[in-house]
Amino acid sequence: MAEVQPTRMELIKLRRRIKMATRGHALLKMKRDGLIMEFRQLLEEAKEVIGGMVQKYEKAQSKLALAIAVDGIVAVRSIALSCCQIPPEFSMKRKNIMGVVVPVIKREPIRKKPTERGYGILSTSTRVDEAVEAYEELVDAVLEVAEIETTLRKLIEEIERTKRRVNALEYRVIPTMEELAKFISFKLEEMDRENIIRLKKLKMKKAKS
């Protein structure tokens, strides 16, 4: 504080900075609260989506077990390799949530017609078709979960960053500037008192002379 020039101009500048910091603090708190609300809403959605994915996984496993029992493990493995030759098609886009850029997976329909799956439908049972269909649904659910989990992670990172900025302004930056403003005000008042005393002494000297 000793290095600060206790001038009225410095005090005016400092008060402007305090005003700006206070406004910034309020805006950041609004952003933090908005992000937390978005996070909570998405978290509820994520619970449902993950629950659905788990159900689809269990269904796919059950259908796979039936397909193996009917067609045999060798045939099912061969069909699985054929299906893997045609990977799912999707593209990545982005959207903005309160300043946070998050991914959006634009998915093409995962479920294909039996003739588009890369294996001979005449040489397999309907159990295989049901298993393949169940896994197609599972892949779609996995992509949806991946999108939501990535968005949640990015939101929580931004919430933590915003919290740190809010706390820095609230507990360090603004209090420090306010203390500095008090110090300058005190010094200016002290200088004013000294000037008044000096003027009184000068008047007294002139009156005596």
From Swiss-Prot:
GO molecular function terms noted in the UniProt entry: ATP binding; proton-transporting ATP synthase activity, rotational mechanism; proton-transporting ATPase activity, rotational mechanism
Keyword DNA repair: no
One Gene Ontology term, aspect cellular component: plasma membrane
Native source organism of the sequence: Archaeoglobus fulgidus (strain ATCC 49558 / DSM 4304 / JCM 9628 / NBRC 100126 / VC-16)
Domain of life: Archaea
The entry's keywords: ATP synthesis, Cell membrane, Hydrogen ion transport, Ion transport, Membrane, Transport
Subunit annotation: Has multiple subunits with at least A(3), B(3), C, D, E, F, H, I and proteolipid K(x).
Protein name listed in UniProt: A-type ATP synthase subunit D
GO biological process, one term: proton motive force-driven plasma membrane ATP synthesis
Keyword presence, Cell membrane: yes
Pfam families reported in the protein's UniProt record: ATP-synt_D
Family: Belongs to the V-ATPase D subunit family.
Membrane topology: Peripheral membrane protein
HAMAP family named in the record: ATP_synth_D_arch (MF_00271)
Localization annotation: Cell membrane
Stated role: Component of the A-type ATP synthase that produces ATP from ADP in the presence of a proton gradient across the membrane.
